[in-house]
A protein has these predicted regions:
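Helix-termination/interfacial motifs at the ends of transmembrane alpha-helices
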Residues: 5-8, 12-25, 143-146, 150-229
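Structural signature of hydrophobic alpha-helical transmembrane segments
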Residues: 3-7, 32-34
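Large intracellular
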Residues: 19-161, 233-290
Length: 290
């Protein structure tokens, strides 16, 4: 909702200010200039990126406007899933994990936490790295190194669409100047026309410059930034899993290992340690009652 509101404010501010200065709205409609700028921009995106990145770019851009923030319930389910998995190891040993991590989609434990099981990448990351831990013969330091490399690779791949969009956005003023120069060339072909005719051609050329700058700073720049922030939010859950596993292998008790992961959750949605204790105590009471 905030993204839609922000977009409305941008358009209202730019066009509203132009209208307040008695600007002619019809002069802003220059299809030829828009074709030049959009064609150059879209073409450069296609030339510079593989189709996988382009597809992910569309998905991430759409997700900016329909994305639901991972709230407290998501964080609770993530932390309690990690707690239950580690408790399963404490009670039944590493072999007890097999029934859950081999086919996590069919695991009763994973299905207890639907917000996590809906996140395929996150669930696969949890299952794969608990499986790695279950194989044994790996130290906390080695696991931390492996997971850090994996997360770096994932971040690089997931951030590529926003980086590509940002670079193209930075080029849009240049494409606007390109369109403006072509407009001036057309104007020079009518140099013997009336002052009004020459003025209209110059105005059309300047609209190209305006459109390129508008796309850069009012659309593509903010959109690429929002895409990057969304990816960083998603990666924070993976960082939580990594830290929890490393702390467990380092010999920390289950609660402290999960709390180490809790500290990597984003500040505005991070539950307090007391909340984690309450959730764990409720789980322990239910398990004892059963």
């Amino acid at each position: 909702m905030l993204k839609v509101l922000g977009s409305f404010i941008i358009i209202a501010g730019v066009l509203g200010g132009y209208a307040m200065a008695n600007g002619d709205m019809a002069m802003l409609w220059q299809p030829a200039e828009m074709v030049i700028i959009l064609g150059a921009g879209i073409g450069s995106l296609i030339v510079g990126n593989p189709k996988e990145v382009l597809g992910e770019m569309l998905t991430q851009a759409k997700g900016v406007f329909i994305y639901r923030r991972r709230g407290e319930e998501f964080q609770r389910q993530l932390l309690m899933l990690l707690y239950e998995l580690l408790e399963t190891v404490e009670v039944g040993g590493l072999k007890a994990l097999d029934q859950h991590i081999e086919e996590p989609e069919e695991s009763e434990l994973f299905n207890k936490y639907p917000l996590i099981s809906q996140e395929r990448n996150l669930m696969a990351f949890i299952a794969d790295n608990f499986r790695l831990m279950a194989m044994g013969k790996i130290s906390a330091h080695e696991l931390e190194g492996f997971l850090e490399q994996e997360l770096d690779a994932m971040e690089g791949a997931l951030m590529q669409p926003s980086r590509s969009l940002h670079k193209t956005g930075e080029a849009m003023p240049g494409f606007g100047i390109l369109a403006a120069i072509m407009g001036i060339v057309i104007t020079m072909g009518h140099i013997d026309g009336s002052v009004a005719e020459i003025g209209n051609h110059v105005a059309a050329a300047l609209v190209g410059t305006f459109f390129g700058i508008f796309l850069c700073y009012c659309l593509m720049g903010p959109l690429s930034n929002a895409m990057g922030l969304r990816i960083k939010t998603e990666l924070s859950a993976l960082e939580c899993v990594r830290t929890t596993l490393v702390a467990h292998l380092a010999g920390k008790p289950t609660l402290l290992a999960v709390d180490a992961g809790r500290k990597l959750i984003e500040q505005d949605v991070k539950p307090a340690f007391k909340e984690l204790e309450v959730w764990v105590n409720d789980f322990e009471e239910q398990r004892d009652a059963a």
